[in-house]
């Protein structure tokens, strides 16, 4: 009888510890990965019998290890349930958007022409940004996640007007940006990657973009806010 009582007491103690652990405050860590692969490779992946998120992520990582794909960006952000959070790793690119004609049009002979004066500027954030809003489903390991991952790249500078002044090249150039972004809400099993979007990067030259695909994977983990030790 005594061993039985001891076993029951031990079981109750373990259950109490588990219940106490469940009642501890929790954080949610969100990991977003952008993985660039070839379009035919994506077609082959989606044609398989197992197209679950973890399986597709394993296949994408295998391509990365074989140099057939590359991880373009990884963003990790932790917050409490039902709280919004954001991160940004950016560089501000300031560029002119409006020009005024030169103040004088009656130029003396042989004087170099005057370039239009810069009148207005804009600032564009170039880099990676992430916004998240996770919540826990009570009594389960399911996580409802709203998130907005975004990558902005400066692709090139296009020349709008060629001009040379007394100091050298003073041509007017405008930046061309490329933005990869999605905005969605999904329900995830904690600790498992899920494929939430496929983005088509644009080529530098006009024409259909059919060679590359950008896979967006997301994973959310439940973390205790207070250490158990």
What are these regions (language model features)?
Residues 7-15:
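Bacterial N-terminal signal peptides
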Residues 1-4:
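Positively charged n-region of N-terminal signal peptides that target proteins for export
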Residues 160-172:
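Solvent-exposed, glycine/polar-rich loop segments of beta-barrel outer-membrane systems
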Residues 15-21:
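A short, compositionally biased domain-edge/stem linker segment
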Residues 21-160, 176-229:
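Extracytoplasmic assembly/pore-lining segments of large envelope/extracellular complexes
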